[in-house]
């Protein structure tokens, strides 16, 4: 990446052709000249910073391609810290493509790489690394709770917390290094108090890691497969949970011949429900295809709901289906049709409910969230992503080693080795310790235009 280039991309999340307006963003030294060249603004409009101008995008022969608004933001008062131009055009596929092509045709302008706008914002001091990541997470949020946690990061919550912990460690390092160089001139250092301070930071980091792991489901969501023999009520349960008729519900076994999906949100956790075809032996070619897809869903699910007919009781088919579920995938045994007289269920079940009447639904929701480790996320205030958690765990491990050094009563300079490692890891979270490898890892996951 050459930071002196001028870059351009479509910045809006809505796919071309699906929104009334699209935004083409341009950033870099040639941004203003590009905007003035591509957009013709009639009358006596003043092309000033942070002012909106009206005009038309024109081609090389002077023909109008689209009616647009032009917004100029001169650096450093822009998202990237550079001169930025935004062209607000119509959202049709042709309109967006023509505007972007005209921009890219300007000398010195190239197409932006994934995440390059945000990367420039970090390099120019407009964002720290945690805020840049929060931008991506806010765009990708699939639930209000996920958006809340992303916004907490965008507001600087993670950066402030990590910076405060890092500064405490820097203070401790300063004390230790002073003792290494000038121990005879300074009063004795209270080693127990120092260890207590390091342990407080370590515990705070472990709490952040645990909270981030619990909140992971809010970001990525869960795939939940509903599995069971035909006519046990899987489709009725899908319709009950999704609050809309997604599956045809009849008394005929094998009605669901394909894999049906429904997107829902339970207590802030995005969940994809997969209503599988009843897995059984059949000569029907279409049903066989649905069963094959069901088995694929079974292997890739985060959790499996094995739906039983609580009225008919436990059968050999139920036992065979239970054996098909991979050992590493959590499973919940759900006895449906609790509104009817109960049959024999020698196999202990986790939840009894009636998909028809809705009884037991809350028990199922809680069992699902607990089995996936997603329960209790309402208490999470800051959610570190995987990269941030790895670094926080590295820092916590380094601080744990410092306790071992203390137990061995080694000299102060031995303490500084692990302390420096913890400080480096925390600095990498926020971007205080910034390398090209860190930037590549973070921004390669971004979409073009962010």
From Swiss-Prot:
Chain sites annotated for binding K(+): 231, 250, 252, 255
Sequence positions that bind (6S)-5-formyl-5,6,7,8-tetrahydrofolate: 25, 86, 126, 450
UniProt domain TrmE-type G: residue ranges: 221-373
Top EC group: hydrolase
Positions annotated to bind GTP: 231-236, 250-256, 275-278, 336-339
GO BP term (any one): tRNA wobble uridine modification
Residues binding Mg(2+), per UniProt: 235, 256
Cellular localization per UniProt: Cytoplasm
PROSITE patterns cross-referenced by the UniProt entry: G_TRME
InterPro entries xref list: G_TrmE, GTP-bd, GTP-bd_TrmE_N, GTPase_MnmE, MnmE_dom2, MnmE_helical, P-loop_NTPase, Small_GTP-bd
The family this protein is said to belong to: Belongs to the TRAFAC class TrmE-Era-EngA-EngB-Septin-like GTPase superfamily. TrmE GTPase family.
Record protein name field: tRNA modification GTPase MnmE
Lineage, highest ranks first: Bacteria, Bacillati, Cyanobacteriota, Cyanophyceae, Synechococcales
The encoding gene: mnmE
